[in-house]
Amino acid sequence: MEQTYQYAWIIPFLPLPVPMLIGLGLLLFPTATKSLRRMWAFQSVLLLSIVMIFSMNLSIQQINSSSVYQYVWSWIINNDFSLEFGYLIDPLTSIMSILITTVGIMVLIYSDNYMSHDHGYLRFFAYMSFFSTSMLGLVTSSNLIQIYIFWELVGMCSYLLIGFWFTRPVAAKACQKAFVTNRVGDFGLLLGILGFYWITGSFEFRDLFQIFNNLISNNEVNFLFVTLCAVLLFAGAIAKSAQFPLHVWLPDAMEGPTPISALIHAATMVAAGIFLVARLMPLFIVIPHIMNFISLIGIITVFLGATLALAQKDIKRGLAYSTMSQLGYMMLALGMGSYRSALFHLITHAYSKALLFLGSGSVIHSMETLVGYCPKKSQNMVLMGGLTKHVPITKNSFLLGTLSLCGIPPLACFWSKDEILNDSWLYSPIFAIIAWSTAGLTAFYMCRIYLLTFEGHLNVHFQNYSGKRNTPLYSISLWGKEGSKISNKNFRLVTLLKMKKNGRPSFFSNKVYKMDENVRNLIQPFLSIPNFGNTKTSLYPYESDNTMLFPILILILFTLFVGFLGIPFNQDVDILSKWLTPSINLLHKNSNNSIDWYEFCKDAVFSVSIASFGIFIAFFLYKPVYSSFQNLDLINSFVKIGPKRIFSDKIKKAIYDWSYNRGYIDAFDGTFLTVGMRKLAEFTHFFDRRIIDGIPNGVGLMSFFVAEVIKSVGGGRISSYLFFYFSYVSIFLLIYYFLNY
């Protein structure tokens, strides 16, 4: 076992040859490298598979022995300062390594087909392999200096992949936004690292935690300064994991290719922030104020992410806000001290979210056959619907991922989210109410995404579709969608969402209608599809190739069974608790993972009931338009005009505006922060040029003019210069004399 640990340093470096060889190949043999470009996908998958096998071997050894291994090389600069580089293998490292490699392999296999048409195929795989190297280096780091180095490399790879299609202005802007937002957090992280080094004199985790605990127990530190340094460290995690208020980059990051969205949201970029807080938990747990602050940021992000996901029309942005909310749950759990629950949810969410993103990529891929390559159209749920019969495998996989994220048993996220929800009652009833309510919102918006994408009819085939924003069909609102006009005058249909001219939503039309015939028999799709600039379009979408479906099917298995790793029914079968034994013993010395069956069933029934209610509301608001009901008296009974109806419409409109406009946070940033920074820059530029530079320039200019005047008066004679010189000296002496008299 010791010998296995000794070679663990190679984990981050195994995927590194791929980007290096691609770069050398493009530099020395560009034609041959491009002609054999599909070969690099196999090499990337092979090397990452070796890392996965090695990581699993380490994990099995840790489960059996509950050990932590650390190896350090010291680089002594002088007697007072030395840099230490090494690697740390503990349960957190092994969990993250398996997560990164398994999801990474699935994404690489998927990308081989998804990116096959792209001219940047080689560049994409070079970035992806370097991304894996950076993230693996981050999770195996043994000190804060290494953490920061790989932290920046992870960010750099994310920026490169977000702006992968850099010729598109929207993608370039999204890349810049991600970079600038994360600069704020990264600068805070750097200051926090330097602050704790100033306090403890060490960057190594084992020394840092021990020295800091001794200082705290002896009351030898300034708690205000310590809290400030901890907040600065946490700022890095806030930006990386898209927590409020530095979350604004995450939805715009969807401008990158869909496979990288899956990797970023499941196991790399956003998971890095959760990993950092989990790694530094021994540091944070002895500072009560910072733990409260972490949980506060987490619960705000939980609710904010869920509300912002309610009205998104872009399928990837809806999933992005879902990720933001679920990361909030993890951060809430860490702030509450529920280390096991947070990591459990990190695992289950990673596979479920990877499944959803790869499923959305399959949908987008199939929609491009209809609308051509245009992300605004191919990712727009307004133009989707009715995909069930065209992409059945993608539909079923997406449904499983949706139900998992909703918290429906026995799927993965049910087990982990339920633990966090139950722990929240013990921490704060207010936080618990918000967390449980958000569970219902999660079920609603995820079911909404599923229904808009797969149920009903294919909206791109509807009559009068032009792709313009002001058309009624384009403007699908928060709560439902609008059907095409039917030429049959006897046709009656309840319009669940009647869009007004200004695009504002209302739930129901102002009239009560009666359905005389079967909707599915009456609505006929119109196949007149406009030309979107891609000549290779077809009338209907089709299922993706097997290369793209294989990773989706594997992720279905993870979504079905990975949750059973952490079911605490029996200590002997609770693999996750055995896995995390060293960390749990460090953080929670008196922890007891035994579970009360009655309490578990009671809480599970309550959580499933809330999720089911959210799903029911989503079906109620969306499904009836496409159902085969002969009589809609139940729905018509809700359609009544009155003061209550008007008031409810105003509430719905406010919710829609809040959600669709991203909580006005981007508008606030653009109006106040961006404009304020520009005005501050203009003021500093004016102050620097006119005041700072103006004073010495003015003195020099004045001296020049005085010299010119004296030169003209003196006439070039030395006697005149001497006369004026002594005259001025006499005048200054007289002035000095009278002032001091």
Swiss-Prot record:
Q: Which residues cross the membrane?
A: 9-29, 40-60, 89-109, 125-145, 147-167, 185-205, 219-239, 258-278, 283-303, 327-347, 354-374, 396-416, 425-445, 549-569, 605-625, 718-738
Q: Which PANTHER family match?
A: NADH-UBIQUINONE OXIDOREDUCTASE CHAIN 5 (PTHR42829:SF2)
What Pfam family is a match for this entry?
Proton_antipo_C
* Single GO term (MF): quinone binding
List the catalysed reactions. a plastoquinone + NADH + (n+1) H(+)(in) = a plastoquinol + NAD(+) + n H(+)(out); a plastoquinone + NADPH + (n+1) H(+)(in) = a plastoquinol + NADP(+) + n H(+)(out)
Q: Give the record's membrane topology.
A: Multi-pass membrane protein
The main location is plastid
Q: Which organism is it from?
A: Athroisma gracile
Its EC number is 7.1.1.-
Q: Which GO terms describe its cellular component?
A: chloroplast thylakoid membrane
Question: Where is this protein localized, as stated in its record?
Answer: Plastid, Chloroplast thylakoid membrane
Gene3D superfamilies for the chain: 1.20.5.2700
Assembly description: NDH is composed of at least 16 different subunits, 5 of which are encoded in the nucleus.
> Which keywords are on file for this protein?
Chloroplast, Membrane, NAD, NADP, Plastid, Plastoquinone, Quinone, Thylakoid, Translocase, Transmembrane, Transmembrane helix, Transport
Protein family according to the UniProt entry: Belongs to the complex I subunit 5 family.
- Specify the protein name: NAD(P)H-quinone oxidoreductase subunit 5, chloroplastic
The record's listing under InterPro entries reads: NADH_UbQ_OxRdtase_chlpt_su5_C, NADHpl_OxRdtase_5_subgr, ND/Mrp_TM, NU5C-like, Proton_antipo_N
* Major enzyme class: translocase
Highest taxon of the lineage: Eukaryota
The biological processes this protein is annotated with in GO are:
ATP synthesis coupled electron transport; electron transport coupled proton transport
NADP as UniProt keyword? yes
Q: Which gene encodes it?
A: ndhF
What is this protein for, i.e. what is its function? NDH shuttles electrons from NAD(P)H:plastoquinone, via FMN and iron-sulfur (Fe-S) centers, to quinones in the photosynthetic chain and possibly in a chloroplast respiratory chain. The immediate electron acceptor for the enzyme in this species is believed to be plastoquinone. Couples the redox reaction to proton translocation, and thus conserves the redox energy in a proton gradient.
